[in-house]
Amino acid sequence: MSFSRRADFSGINFGYNTGFDIAYSGTVGAAMEALINGIPAIAFSSQHDGSSDVTDKYLVPVIEELLSSPIGRGEIWNVNFPGCALEDCRGILRERIPAPLCVFDNHYDKTEQPDGSFILRPYAEQLSPDRAPEGSDIHAVFNGYVSIGKVKSMVLPSSDKSTHAWQRVFPVLFVL
């Protein structure tokens, strides 16, 4: 495999980087750091239960595809490999958007103690697959697909031609 351009690969993270979880992902954050430095980037994540067969099969073809695919200024690729057996993987879904949800719904159970104090215990429940919006990254991985999508930087200018006020005030910060 030969690469025609320099790129940053971040990951492979254990656990999905989908939906709202992208916001605090170190894997996606590292890819964004590369982007800030003008380097195209791909963030990879995988949810597996002891087997990396799906990742092993799809990783190189996905890398080859994405390195030859155009991506907008201010965007990175985000790839998530499903947590299923290879025989249950249904292929690749492209152009997945981040779901407006988290894979795990986090709660705290509050228990009052006899002395009047409280104990808070964290509790996480996995999102029901039927709640994942169709076309989203979570829907793809929950249904046994490799999910490929773009994540846009909220700080860097996008590839569209619009000029935001902050770009006019701080133009030197946005040169790639």
Label every PLM stretch briefly.
Residues 16-25:
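Glycine/threonine-rich flexible loop motifs
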Residues 14-17, 48:
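A short, flexible beta-alpha/helix-coil linker loop
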Residues 1-3, 29-40:
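Alpha-helix C-terminal capping segments
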Residues 1-6, 14:
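Proline-aspartate-enriched helix->loop->beta-strand connector
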Residues 35-55:
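Glycine-rich phosphate/pyrophosphate-binding loops
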Residues 56-176:
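Electrostatically charged, flexible surface regions
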Residues 19, 51-54, 158:
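Secondary-structure boundary/capping motif
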